[in-house]
Amino acid sequence: MFYFASAPKTSDLVALRTRVDELHLKETLTEKEASTLKVLSGLHNVRNKALPYGRGTFDIIQLSEIGQGKAAPFLNFDFNLQLVAFILLFIGFAIKVPVFPFHTWLPDAHVEAPTPISMILAGVLLKMGGYGIIRIAYPICPLGAQYCSFALVLLGVFSIIYGAFAALAQTDFKRMVAYSSVSHMGYVLLGLAVWKLGEDGATVGKDYWLTGVNAAMFQMIAHGVSSAGMFFMVGVIYDRVHHRDLNQYGGLMGLMPLYGGLAVGLFFAGLGLPGLCGFIGEIFSVLAAWNYSKLLAIIAASGVILTAGYILWAIQRVYLGPEYKGPHPEAITPINQREAAIGFILLFFAILLGVYPAFLFNLMQASTTQFVNNLDAVFTTAPEALKAAGGF
């Protein structure tokens, strides 16, 4: 219900304090409603399966136990049910992530939203999709998740490359940052999906997959910091000159040195520069993918080069280069204390997570290890029970 409630409220926030194009607002709301309906359809399917056995529930833990064969042979979600339910759940959550081709609402929503709402969208809302895939889709439908793993890896890699190329093509500063989110969240899906089974049913390179899951979790948090920071820095200059045309910016480092320094630091975090938060999740996702497919890992790694291309190009056009030539040059004034405080806080966390990633990994290690062990056990310690229940 709370997931469903986020759909109209997201649209309300996007429309806050701005004259939103009605078509864009309807698109955002429609995408959110479609996301919710897919999730509800998937959960409804698995609940109906359990209903005749007195287990008609939406309790995530109980549904996960059934899906993982812990209730077999008396009750189990067979392969066909898990496949259909997983696809529905994944599509529903992927719209929120978002990954290609479910991303179309995101650039328009960010462009129309006020700066604080863009920061919330990037830092919190997108993570609801990733959390749902990890917390609900995989544990309840492990057979479907494993069967779709190759398709998910392809989708993650394509999102990385597509999002980067789309960002390169933008002239709107905020839309460029929005497309960068599509690329960065592709690493989340890549790290999560590199689940590879051997002929004996055991996970091949289990430690690599655990690394990928840890990377996916870390990347979601790191992206929440760097992307929120980039949107904030776009908003700071937009509030002064009221445009986002990259071709009309220039020389802001000289006009607003403190703002320029904070902005470059946060954009470097989004770039994935070593020592900043964006580097850890991306490099570990690529390392995990190397065990799954060396070719796909190389393609995913090339996304880092493309990311450097559009981030450095934006820095050169906005903060360096010739003098500012857009409207309202008289409004370009140094940032105030409130803006500086927000920028410093975000940059502090970007540096903290970059130089001391163990701060997060230590918190999540126990949960991610249990997550991987539980799903691996579906294909190792409990295959006979699942077969008896029609799971394979």
Predicted regions mapped to residue ranges:
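Residue-level recognition of transmembrane alpha-helices
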Residues: 123, 177-181, 219-220, 263-266, ...
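Membrane-interface alpha-helices at helix entry/exit sites of multi-pass transporters
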Residues: 113-123, 244-261, 297-303
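Internal transmembrane alpha-helices of multipass membrane proteins
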Residues: 110, 123-124, 148-208
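Alpha-helical transmembrane segments and their helix-entry boundary regions
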Residues: 105, 118-120, 176-177, 212-216, ...
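Juxtamembrane/interfacial segments at transmembrane-helix boundaries in multi-pass membrane proteins
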Residues: 1-94, 98-101, 133-151, 194-214, ...
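Predominantly late transmembrane helices and immediately cytosolic-facing juxtamembrane segments
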Residues: 227-231, 296-331
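Alpha-helical transmembrane segments
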Residues: 79-92, 214-229, 295-308
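Small-residue-rich segments of transmembrane alpha-helices in multi-pass membrane proteins
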Residues: 1, 116-129, 181-194, 256-263
